[in-house]
Amino acid sequence: MKPGIHPTYAEITATCTCGNIIKVNSTAGKSLHLDVCGACHPFYTGTQKVVDTGGRIDKFNKRFGILGKK
């Protein structure tokens, strides 16, 4: 590796709105503020909401459901 051309790594803190603090190495050199992290993201915590698309599915089946039946 050539000396003097690589960026320096510094340990920074990434702080989430839930209060979770993550320490990472970065070349940016400043702390980060995160909106969501793995500790509070709805997918990982199991609190995700199911979007009601029943009307769309019924409309699709009414329109194209006959084509799939044999």
UniProtKB/Swiss-Prot annotation:
Keywords associated with the record: Metal-binding, Ribonucleoprotein, Ribosomal protein, RNA-binding, rRNA-binding, Zinc
Keyword Metal-binding: yes
Record's protein name: Large ribosomal subunit protein bL31
Protein task: Binds the 23S rRNA.
GO biological process: translation
Chain's gene name: rpmE
Chain sites annotated for binding Zn(2+): 16, 18, 37, 40
Quaternary organization: Part of the 50S ribosomal subunit.
Gene3D superfamilies: Ribosomal protein L31 (4.10.830.30)
CC cofactor note: Binds 1 zinc ion per subunit.
Cofactor names: Zn(2+)
Classification via PANTHER family: 50S RIBOSOMAL PROTEIN L31, CHLOROPLASTIC (PTHR33280), LARGE RIBOSOMAL SUBUNIT PROTEIN BL31A (PTHR33280:SF6)
Pfam families per the UniProt record, alphabetical: Ribosomal_L31
Similarity annotation: Belongs to the bacterial ribosomal protein bL31 family. Type A subfamily.
GO function terms (MF aspect): metal ion binding; rRNA binding; structural constituent of ribosome
